Amino acid sequence: MKIKLIVGLANPGAEYAATRHNAGAWYVELLAERYRQTLKEESKFYGYTGRLTLGGQDVRLLVPTTFMNLSGKAVAAMATFYRIAPEDILVAHDELDLLPGSARLKLGGGHGGHNGLKDIISRLGNNPQFHRLRIGISHPGDKNQVVGFVLGKPPTAERQLIDSAIDEAVRCTEILVTQDAVKAMNRLHAYRPG
């Protein structure tokens, strides 16, 4: 396994930039900033793209500018162009089943109702075997309130917790890319904010 493409899921536009559903994009944006890279819009990949070198390895970055439920269009375009296999892709996304201040890495799995993941799995030939960075945003407690919740902006204290987990995930990214997933998982999963 070699991570060659890191994707941060989001909805496009200023009105969504600070919403919980864009937590994946917050991670990719911080990653680019840490490594002094600028994300540039590339229409052929339907998103903002960048490139990092981690431990001598080239890693592409992507924040789709499609709506969340069409994220797979951007991911498939970039993966096809650079011949990147699903198992070499890391997709960062908001996760209702984790609390703010926590993040988890995993390989494969279902989409858990997340429309961005659902479309990516479909566009990668129904292949769910890509890595996920699940960024905790919590759950509103009622499934009927989920849409409003993910499209809402977290209060300041909650956003600080989400940002602290993203910050730790960025620190673990080089371990994931240059060493191994288990080491990165152990460090990230042990993280506690504060």
Curated annotation (Swiss-Prot):
Highest taxon above the source species: Bacteria
Residues annotated for tRNA binding in this entry: Y16, F67, N69, N115
Gene: pth
Pfam families noted in UniProt: Pept_tRNA_hydro (PF01195)
Task performed by this protein: Hydrolyzes ribosome-free peptidyl-tRNAs (with 1 or more amino acids incorporated), which drop off the ribosome during protein synthesis, or as a result of ribosome stalling. Catalyzes the release of premature peptidyl moieties from peptidyl-tRNA molecules trapped in stalled 50S ribosomal subunits, and thus maintains levels of free tRNAs and 50S ribosomes.
One example GO MF annotation: peptidyl-tRNA hydrolase activity
Protein name in the entry: Peptidyl-tRNA hydrolase
Family recorded in the similarity comment: Belongs to the PTH family.
Lineage of the species this protein comes from: Bacteria, Pseudomonadati, Pseudomonadota, Gammaproteobacteria, Enterobacterales
